[in-house]
């Protein structure tokens, strides 16, 4: 595991850039930082955890992708995955260019998620969260809680 941390200094006005080279990556956790992945992440199974206002952009090619995005973060995903399991809270996840076959999505606390799904979508929204999806899944299981939110097809 590689952990990169930097101490906060309010007097400093420069940005630190770090380049990480990898050959095999299973999981990414980003907090309080901006991260851009220049290469496509290719794995059978891959996990992404974003928090603390992080801004992350990546392209994936996976069979199974698990995403957890919290804390006013912004995650932009593109590419394709067969199975997507996602939990997003108080954040935005733009997966307009992420193509999935089957997705399980839980969106809460004013979060907004955009995805493409072709066959199966299981979705839950609560506390004013929004799920916008493209595609015509044959199986659609959706639930909006008492505290609002919505799930909409935007094709």
Predicted regions and their residues:
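Acidic (Asp/Glu) and glycine-rich low-complexity loops/linkers
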Residues: 1-51, 64-68, 78, 82-85, ...
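Short, surface-exposed interaction patches in beta-rich subdomains
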Residues: 75-155
